[in-house]
Amino acid sequence: MNLFTEIRTLVTAELGAMTEAGDLPAGLDLSAVAVEPPRDPAHGDMSTNAAMVLAKPSGKPPRTIAEALATRLAADPRISSAEVAGPGFLNLRLRPAVWQGMVATILQAGDTYGRSTIGAGQKVNVEFVSANPTGPMHVGHVRGAVVGDALARLLAYAGWNVTREYYINDGGAQVDVLARSAFERYREAHGLEPEIREGLYPGDYLIPVGEALKAKYGDSLLDKGEQHWLTEVREFATEMMMQMIREDLAALGVEMDVYSSEKALYGTGKIEAALDRLKEMDLIYEGVLEPPKGKTPEDWEPREQTLFRSTAHGDDVDRPVKKSDGSWTYFAPDIAYHYDKVTRGFDQLIDIFGADHGGYVKRMKAAVAALSAGRVPLDIKLIQLVKLWKNGEPFKMSKRAGTYVTLRDVVEQVGTDVTRFVMLTRKNDATLDFDFDKVLEQSKENPVFYVQYANARINSVLRKAREQGMDVSDATLATADLDRLDHPAEIALIAKLAEWPRLVEIAARTNEPHRVAFYLHELASELHGLWNRGNDEAGLRFLQDDPVVSQAKIALARAVGVVICAGLGILGVTPVEEMR
């Protein structure tokens, strides 16, 4: 049950009644009418912009509309007051019984409270991580993996049919570098000195690959030239790296539904098919691009190339898809890959890219818009950097030097749950500080602890109540005398719980799972605030001498626990029942 949707339905019904009464003209578009929490809680429980958005199309002053609407709304038994503010905003206060009833609603719904059907079963593809298969995942990949997986969980929670997908970048030059690096470890496995030349991957993680190559091929490759072993070693090393990456993802609680290979696009006609489709729309041509201003990108040539007319779909410049020597640019297989996703019948595509792919956003959106005839929206989320801190100092990494911090390093030091939660404590496009010391602190400054501690406190109340012989099942607590929850601090906590279904829908529509983490922190803050006030005001404690009052307060605590557990589930974090 979404209380905000319920009150919006009331508002639009009264606007319809005003139309029938001749107070408003017929045919008004009510889609922009919103009901939401006011910016300042002192102004009321909810606020609506109805009068503001209808003033111009109705030809009436907004305050005139607001005053007439306020009179009608105040007559509803759920509304205690409706006050016009400013130029025509309408602030509403709900009767305590509405809030008190929310506790029973939550307990009756259980883990379905907040679930939504706004996705309507639409098929959405969330592509994330897609790290080059050249080594273990590092901390930079962790954030994208967590954001992508949490987003997939959120969308499924809100009614979408979600596919998690990993695009294996195994068609470029980097996998040849991997093969050459692995071959040196193969030589090392035979007792020879490896030649880790400039540009090769020096990490020790390739030593097991060299040993595995030795086990499979013996010494048969040692005396052969690169042209004889490159393909086999590349495929062997790539598969071992992907197995390592799958294990890394599993350690983070991430499981992909589909793994797609870039290499599979070559030689199968898929790239040609995608570009032929664009050519049919007159979006492929031969031409010479003007030299770009500033830094010259690697796909620019001062000669004729095959170009995609991406400017026809919002890009700044047209983009090369085939070089003058006949080879494909990096963009060409990406177009083919996204065309493949379109032809698989997805209604929506989401890509989670690193911040260094910012220049790819417009061209990729242009390609999908063209290939789907505007039917399939593509949302690209850019993941900013993670800055590591340890012992109060920045901790830097270098992949080329083989000294980077891996996903396993992070998970082994702080755990999967802490890692996942912290990675969602900032919006994806903001740099995130990950302090190995602070994320394990038991203090209110640590958001992971703060939320988990709230859940642990709730469970401590339930345990004590059981020890006293109380039935604390959801079904029984839902029948409590909830009128006893009449303190403003208790009502404020319930009001925060009432925001959960609305928050889920907003987060899902905007593809922003960090909103869930932010909300959980706010909810935990309300719970801790009420708990701490109980230290000084005995009447606010969750366990009371009066069993009727006690049952009502325990019902409230349990309702908070239901929502916290639901939110943590979306984040992929296991709720803690007891702090140790």
Curated annotation (Swiss-Prot):
It is found in: Cytoplasm. InterPro entries: aa-tRNA-synth_I_CS (IPR001412), Arg-tRNA-ligase (IPR001278), Arg-tRNA-synth_N (IPR005148), Arg-tRNA-synth_N_sf (IPR036695), ArgRS_core (IPR035684), DALR_anticod-bd (IPR008909), Rossmann-like_a/b/a_fold (IPR014729), tRNAsynth_Ia_anticodon-bd (IPR009080). One of its GO terms (molecular function) is ATP binding. One of its GO terms (cellular component) is cytoplasm. The keyword Acetylation does not apply. PROSITE patterns: AA_TRNA_LIGASE_I. A motif ('HIGH' region) lies at residues 131-141. Gene3D superfamilies: Arginyl tRNA synthetase N-terminal domain, HUPs, Isoleucyl-tRNA Synthetase, Domain 1. It holds the Pfam family Arg_tRNA_synt_N. SUPFAM superfamilies: Anticodon-binding domain of a subclass of class I aminoacyl-tRNA synthetases, Arginyl-tRNA synthetase (ArgRS), N-terminal 'additional' domain, Nucleotidylyl transferase. It catalyses: tRNA(Arg) + L-arginine + ATP = L-arginyl-tRNA(Arg) + AMP + diphosphate. Its main location: cytoplasm. Keywords: Aminoacyl-tRNA synthetase, ATP-binding, Cytoplasm, Ligase, Nucleotide-binding, Protein biosynthesis. Its EC number is 6.1.1.19. The keyword Calcium does not apply. Monomer. NCBIfam families: argS. Belongs to the class-I aminoacyl-tRNA synthetase family. PANTHER family: ARGININE--TRNA LIGASE, CYTOPLASMIC (PTHR11956:SF5), ARGINYL-TRNA SYNTHETASE (PTHR11956). HAMAP family: Arg_tRNA_synth. This is Arginine--tRNA ligase. It comes from Cereibacter sphaeroides (strain ATCC 17023 / DSM 158 / JCM 6121 / CCUG 31486 / LMG 2827 / NBRC 12203 / NCIMB 8253 / ATH 2.4.1.).
